[in-house]
Amino acid sequence: WDKQTGAWLIPATNKCKAELDQLTYYVRHFEPVQWGTVAQSQTEEDVAFQIPEMPELDGDHGLKVQPYPYQLQGIARGLQLKRFINGDDMGLGKTLESIATINKADAFPCLVICPNVVKINWQREWHKFTDKKAMVLTDSVRDSWPFFWQTGMNQVFIVNYESLRKYFVRRITKAEKWTLKDVEFHNTIKLFKSVIIDESHKVKSTATQQTKFCKGIASGKEYII
């Protein structure tokens, strides 16, 4: 920092020039930077964003209970988007909206991936809201669960994050530092038409096993919530 000139001095190297060119690019292409003291600074005008109105659901919602009007709109929007994050606040009924969206779309079989402690709750909610039968995957049906879909006994299958490898992964071809392309899944994952990923913050890191498994299983599915 040069006190006399009031400027920063940097070495005249190619590396510094490249970084300076990049900085100049951002300054030119984004909002102009206004320099001055706090007293001299001007308040930028507020930017107003127009949020589109939510659609209304056409036809019967297909549930055993009557959803709230905002939930019906959420279901309608989910049917439009097909792949989306349900960002409703806690307690507003995200589970109902997700179940209703899959049920209305008839996107079965459906796989629900969730924390271990809420598997039974998801099963109860499916039975409470719809006439579909939900199964929690256990060791007793590790290899036979597709039979329950093929015979019409179950339409929904529920699994916790930690068990994805057990039920859906045939093998991983590398011992260390493996990526999704090194994972061989069982062909049974192709059966699913939809996937619900509950508590999806658990798959925010692309470096974790469960994120890679979720991505591989959900890839190509018409409905992903």
Model-based region annotation:
Residues 1-62:
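Accessory DNA-engaging acidic/polar modules
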Residues 44-77, 83-86, 92-210, 219-221:
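SF2 helicase/translocase NTPase motor core
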